[in-house]
Amino acid sequence: MQKLQIFVYIYLFMLLVAGPVDLNENSEQKENVEKKGLCNACLWRQSNKSSRLEAIKIQILSKLRLETAPNISKDAIRQLLPKAPPLRELIDQYDVQRDDSSDGSLEDDDYHVTTETVITMPTESDLLAEVQEKPKCCFFKFSSKIQHNKVVKAQLWIYLRPVKTPTTVFVQILRLIKPMKDGTRYTGIRSLKLDMNPGTGIWQSIDVKTVLQNWLKQPESNLGIEIKALDENGHDLAVTFPEPGEEGLNPFLEVKVTDTPKRSRRDFGLDCDEHSTESRCCRYPLTVDFEAFGWDWIIAPKRYKANYCSGECEFLFLQKYPHTHLVHQANPKGSAGPCCTPTKMSPINMLYFNGKEQIIYGKIPGMVVDRCGCS
């Protein structure tokens, strides 16, 4: 009996030391674990978002074949941007991105930018030293984007100053050649006649596809061109070297090249937002702001929706990848787990300055995440 009393006293003492028992302790611990899991998921998503932003900066420079971002100031950009219809059209009707991901197709993209339009401004040439007299305008250098693609359209754009009275203007585009025995230094490319009325000046385009193709085949024949636009009184209305107040009115070439068609296949995935509690692999929204990067050399878009992938890839969700599941079942410790990665990427169109201060309009593949999946 005495032993029983001693046991009871010891039991009561242990209860006093342990304190009151909380019946909700297990549920609170479970809730804390769930909150910690959600917090870890948020941190993981934030890490993926930051990594995606840095990867985008590297990818853009790499796909544009630029070692570093072009160092062009905002003031220089304002002076270099031509105030011309084709450029305004590209900016005003700019298709920032194609977010038609509902079809679930996966593009087999090339890595580098697919150029669609190149706007080339005139520059100086050492070849002009071979002739006694330099032309009034102009010499154009062509990047590898033009040289290595099929040219489908090439137009020379010139600006004609306004007139005070109605007049007929005779426009002539001449190609500079090496002096011949009879002293001839020019050969005609195009000529046209147009009527101008008083008012503002006008932009006029001239087809130069044939001469451009000849220049690409024989680069040594590209010595430059001369532009003349004479009214009935013999006044030259063409802006070749802009005067004060005529910034952005330089002549320029607009060249369009072929685009490579893409193949596609089917694919599907989950879409989530930043407040989602979904743990599985999912696509999350992410907006890239080029102005925040300090990348003023990108004319358009100033920002675009890039998106990113984040989430778990449990083998429970991998009916789509049976081979991965079988490998894991055979060797669960030795096989690497699947990762949440993009399974559908789409391009963006971009208008930008390259390192030679040329304006390029191109399509950059693989810049928008449209679908995410485990692989």
From Swiss-Prot:
GO cellular component: extracellular space
The species this protein was found in: Capra ibex (Ibex)
PROSITE patterns linked to this entry: TGF_BETA_1, TGF_BETA_2
Cystines in this chain: C272-C282, C281-C340, C309-C372, C313-C374
Signal peptide segment: 1-18
Free-text description of this protein's post-translational modifications in UniProt: Synthesized as large precursor molecule that undergoes proteolytic cleavage to generate an N-terminal propeptide and a disulfide linked C-terminal dimer, which is the biologically active molecule. The circulating form consists of a latent complex of the C-terminal dimer and other proteins, including its propeptide, which maintain the C-terminal dimer in a latent, inactive state. Ligand activation requires additional cleavage of the prodomain by a tolloid-like metalloproteinase.
Subcellular location(s) of the protein: Secreted
Role of this protein: Acts specifically as a negative regulator of skeletal muscle growth.
InterPro entries: Cystine-knot_cytokine, TGF-b_C, TGF-b_propeptide, TGF-beta-rel, TGFb_CS
Protein name as catalogued: Growth/differentiation factor 8
Propeptide residues, chain positions: 19-266
